[in-house]
Amino acid sequence: MNTKRIRRDWNAQQRPVIGGSGRAPRRGWRGRVVPLLVVALVLPVVFAGWLWFHVDSSVHRIDAFEDYSGRPEAAAGTNWLVVGSDSREGLDPETAAGLHVGDASGQRTDTIMVAHLPDNSTVPTLISVPRDSRVPVPGQGRTKINEAFAVGGPHLLAQTVEQATGLRIDHYAEVGFGGFAGLVEAVGGVEMCLEGEMHDAKTGQTLQAGCQTLEGPDALTFVRMRYSDATPRSDLDRVANQRRFIGALVSEASSITTLINPFRAYALADEGAGALTMLDSDGPGDLLSLAWAMRGMSSGGLVTTTVPVTDATASKWDRQKASRLFAAMEADDPVPEDLIVN
């Protein structure tokens, strides 16, 4: 055997190729693209999970509604009590002046709504309860429903609504003046088309006719206005405008332009968490269910109306019509057409 030749061949195999770089071969395009795709897929999931945690940990909480003698039994679907309070908590005098909300002390309801999310294929329902409605308030006799919140907060209001409607309230969501304005600002304002000029004789604020983007202060003016030639039915026109605006706000908040923009999505989640008061038994998933149902308002996927009343003062309910409305909601049945008034 020629051992010298074998040794030369072995040494040649160990030498680097002349002119070679000695580096590992470059990765192909797949090696560069795949990691980027993984990051692109994982980051949104991580961001969404963080937003979920942020909302859940930042929202204001109150104790869950307790049972009491005569409380309505749970029925079909799920019922939300949605409240807009005139709370000025956290607003300094300058901010309150900029929002044109005055400086009244105490806390009252500026908006009372009941949202019914059915278990079947029936369209969800959102009804406004006029705040001047005179109903029995536990411990207070027959008085304005607004008084329940002023005296006993969310729990007495929920009990009052339950006894007046026969509907069991499962969830609660409340937003104050400052929180509402912040939500509107977080989505970049909400576009509304006004048929005519709206001038509020009480606050002196004016909204021009035509399509426009309403920012926080103007949005508050729109949803609160009832002393105006543009709202001849006073509170009945006001609550109709509130439902109209909330539908547009939810549509904007759930739009693809908002959801794919991390800065706007964060601002919305942050403002929403800071603005909302919910039951300690409620979570982000419950809130998403409500938002998903309400986003159909502008497209006809949500029935909206007001509790039937006997006159423009909206203080006395039409008991026969109101009973039919509440019975339909309790049974997950469609709301009769003659009860849908906007």
Give the residues covered by each predicted segment.
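Non-catalytic, solvent-exposed segments at the cell envelope interface
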Residues: N2-N342
